[in-house]
Amino acid sequence: IWFDRTSSVGWLRISDVSKTVKYLTETTQSLSELGIANSRFVPQGNLVMSICATVGKPIITSVNLCIHDGFVVFNGLSVIQDHMYYILKKLEPEWSKQGQTGSQMNLNTELINTTLVLIPQSQAEQTAIATILSDMDTDISSLQQQLSKTRQIKQGMMQELLTGKTRLKV
C-alpha cells in the first residue's frame, strides 16, 4: 500500500500546487513507508515547480513531502529562496506557452536548465526585492478579500432592493 492517511509525509499532486499561492502547507494525500521509499523525498522549506499539466508553477514547501517526475526541486542554489520564487513566478507565463503538448502539457527540463536569469549579487538586494514583492502579494490578497466581501454586500443589497423587501424614500 502506497498511501497512509496517518503519515506526516505528503504526496505532492498537481492539484495541490494549483490551489497553492506561495507556501504549500498541506497535501491531499500522504504516503506510507513503502511509498516514501519509492519516491523522491523533499524536506519542508524547498522550492518546487510543476513541469507537467499546470507547468511552471512554483511553490515553497512548508511540509515534508515526496514528489514524482512531474516536479523539479530547486535546492542548493546560491540565491535567496524567496527571490528565486519570484523569478520563477515571472517566468511561469512564458513556460506555460513553451510547454510541450501530448496527453498533457509538459515542460522540458532542458529548457529550465538553460534559462538564464538576472540575479543581483547582493543577498541583501535579493531579500529586499523578495520582501517588496511579498508585501505586494499581501496587499493584493487583502484587496481581493475586500472585493469579495463588497460583492457579497452588493448581492445582498440587490436582493433587498430589487425584490421590494427594502424600499428607498426618494
Regions found by a protein language model. Give the residues of each.
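A generic structural signal for residues embedded in beta-strands
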Residues: 49-50, 135
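Active-site/binding-pocket entry motifs
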Residues: 17-18, 54-55, 94
